[in-house]
């Protein structure tokens, strides 16, 4: 695919007598289809496509954003040459970072090693598939010329940008608090990118949770009251809530759900870093198992810290109109009538739910990632937005399915003091009661609205997350 480009426009080591400006000028003339001395975005798209040059996602727009210095919507030769020179320098650094033994070639084992350092585990077979897409001469190694030719018009500037595609990011918020925290590189920590990404994720979570709050409240109502009447379906549940408290009541408890994002994220991130240090030796990179254990323990720590807010959210969601004037009034009444212990009702099933959720979520995501790399990573390791969102949504849904009975018991334990004549049962007692009176389906009451909110939550949080990253300077506009 790249032989024409290598042999005519970008000569290899055997033809280095041709100066870079001449190379760039020849290529520029090929792209300037109407010969007016400038290249617009449509000429760039058509020209690169006709030359068979591989492009990254939204490559043309990114090239123009970076290269069009005077912002006239066109690239003249000077702008074109400057962009390619600057981009080649960045790609040279990326090439050197992958070439671990400094022999001037990248091998499959070096790709595996480099990706492992950055937190992405792939097999050597998967690395060979990626290598084949870049390797033009069939040697199963990639030299500098092949690397440069492949990435010449791909705005990805370093290997870490490729890894960011495959990060199982918590920027995608579906309203659950059991996910494993994000992994940040040392450069991201030093540059302050980490807190910007966490802030972007927090804002995305707030918008996403607020947008899907009616479905979340319906889920809680079905978990708590569903056993009383088989008639509480989705339509009937919404009708009942609106009749009791009006449209605004659909968002009851959402304020607490949004407020707890900040302390929970902060504690989880801090705890995750501490547990990683305990589980790995200095200088050693964290593996998938250590990440799972550290993430689960960090989640448990964060949940311990903010759990009273989980109880408040449930009480507010289940409460009747006028029962509580707000979060602080609810806390005051619980403390007065039930004591401090009420703020940790349902804590044990909540804690137990972290392991199946986080473990299955991570395992399914890794499985989907491996499947994609094995079967579809022929031209790029960038899977595209839809694949990433689909993998994230599916893995999270599987995690929810496994941990849902524990989540339901937790919610009932949090709310059972509000239900008249309801016995105050512990976790085992509630499981027995539900199974004896409602059967296995009783452990999954409310799961339909819970699944219904996954797709809108993923879509909304992704859009807000990406826009917030641009606003905060994490990514370019």
From Swiss-Prot:
Mitochondrial matrix side: 216-252, 310-345, 407-445
Location of N6-acetyllysine modifications: 320, 336, 437
Keyword entries, A-Z: Acetylation, Antiport, Calcium, Membrane, Metal-binding, Mitochondrion, Mitochondrion inner membrane, Repeat, Transmembrane, Transmembrane helix, Transport
Binding-site list for Ca(2+) 2: 68, 70, 72, 74, 79
Main location: mitochondrion
Entry binding sites for Ca(2+) 3: 99, 101, 103, 105, 110
GO annotation terms (biological process): adenine nucleotide transport; ADP transport; ATP transport; cellular response to calcium ion; cellular response to oxidative stress; mitochondrial ATP transmembrane transport
Function of the molecule: Electroneutral antiporter that mediates the transport of adenyl nucleotides through the inner mitochondrial membrane. Originally identified as an ATP-magnesium/inorganic phosphate antiporter, it also acts as a broad specificity adenyl nucleotide antiporter. By regulating the mitochondrial matrix adenyl nucleotide pool could adapt to changing cellular energetic demands and indirectly regulate adenyl nucleotide-dependent metabolic pathways. In vitro, a low activity is also observed with guanyl and pyrimidine nucleotides.
Entry text on domains: The regulatory N-terminal domain/NTD formed of two pairs of fused calcium-binding EF-hands, binds calcium in the mitochondrial intermembrane space and regulates the antiporter activity of the transmembrane domain/TMD. In absence of calcium, the apo form of the N-terminal domain is intrinsically disordered and binds to the transmembrane domain, inhibiting the transporter activity. Binding of calcium leads to a major conformational change and abolishes the interaction with the transmembrane domain and the inhibition of the transporter activity.
Protein name as catalogued: Mitochondrial adenyl nucleotide antiporter SLC25A24
Native species: Bos taurus (Bovine)
């Amino acid at each position: 695919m790249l032989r024409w480009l290598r042999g005519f426009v970008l000569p290899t080591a055997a033809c280095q007598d041709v100066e870079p400006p001449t190379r760039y000028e020849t290529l520029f003339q090929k792209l300037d289809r109407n010969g007016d001395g400038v290249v617009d975005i449509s000429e760039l798209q058509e020209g690169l496509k006709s030359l068979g040059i591989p492009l990254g996602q939204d490559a043309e727009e990114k090239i123009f954003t970076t290269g069009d210095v005077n912002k006239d919507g066109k690239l003249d030769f000077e702008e074109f040459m400057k962009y390619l020179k600057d981009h080649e320098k960045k790609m040279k650094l990326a090439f050197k970072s992958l070439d671990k033994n400094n022999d001037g070639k990248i091998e499959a084992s070096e790709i595996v090693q480099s990706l492992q350092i950055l937190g992405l585990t792939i097999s050597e077979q998967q690395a060979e598939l990626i290598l084949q897409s870049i390797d033009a001469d069939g040697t199963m190694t990639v030299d500098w010329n092949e690397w440069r030719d492949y990435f010449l018009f791909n705005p990805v500037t370093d290997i870490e940008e490729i890894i960011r595609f495959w990060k199982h990011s918590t920027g995608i918020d579906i309203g659950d608090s059991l996910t494993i925290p994000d992994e940040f590189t040392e450069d991201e920590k030093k540059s302050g990118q980490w807190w910007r990404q966490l802030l972007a994720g927090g804002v995305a979570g707030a918008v996403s949770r607020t947008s899907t709050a009616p479905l979340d409240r319906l889920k809680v109502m079905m978990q708590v009251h569903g056993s009383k009447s088989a008639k509480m379906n989705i339509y009937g549940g919404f009708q009942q809530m609106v009749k009791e408290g009006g449209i605004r009541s659909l968002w009851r408890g959402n304020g607490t759900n949004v407020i707890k994002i900040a302390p929970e994220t902060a504690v989880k991130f801090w705890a995750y870093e501490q547990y990683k240090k305990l589980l790995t030796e200095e200088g050693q990179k964290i593996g998938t198992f250590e990440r799972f254990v550290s993430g689960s323990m960090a989640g448990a720590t964060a949940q311990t810290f903010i759990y009273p807010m989980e109880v408040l959210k449930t009480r507010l969601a289940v409460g009747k109109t006028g029962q509580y004037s707000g979060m602080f009034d609810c806390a005051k009444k619980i403390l007065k009538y039930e004591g401090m212990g009420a703020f940790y009702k349902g804590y044990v099933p909540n804690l137990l739910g972290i392991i199946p959720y986080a473990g299955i979520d991570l395992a399914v995501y890794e499985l989907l990632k491996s499947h994609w790399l094995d079967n579809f990573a022929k031209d790029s390791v960038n899977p595209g937005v839809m694949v990433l969102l689909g993998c994230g949504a599916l893995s999270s849904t599987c995690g929810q399915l496994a941990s849902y009975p524990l989540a339901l018991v937790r919610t009932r334990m949090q709310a059972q003091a509000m239900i008249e004549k309801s016995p105050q049962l512990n976790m085992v007692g509630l499981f027995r009661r539900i199974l004896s009176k409602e059967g296995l389906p009783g452990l999954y009451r409310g799961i339909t609205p819970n699944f219904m909110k996954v797709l809108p939550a993923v879509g909304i949080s992704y859009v807000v997350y990406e826009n917030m990253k641009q606003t905060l300077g994490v990514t370019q506009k």
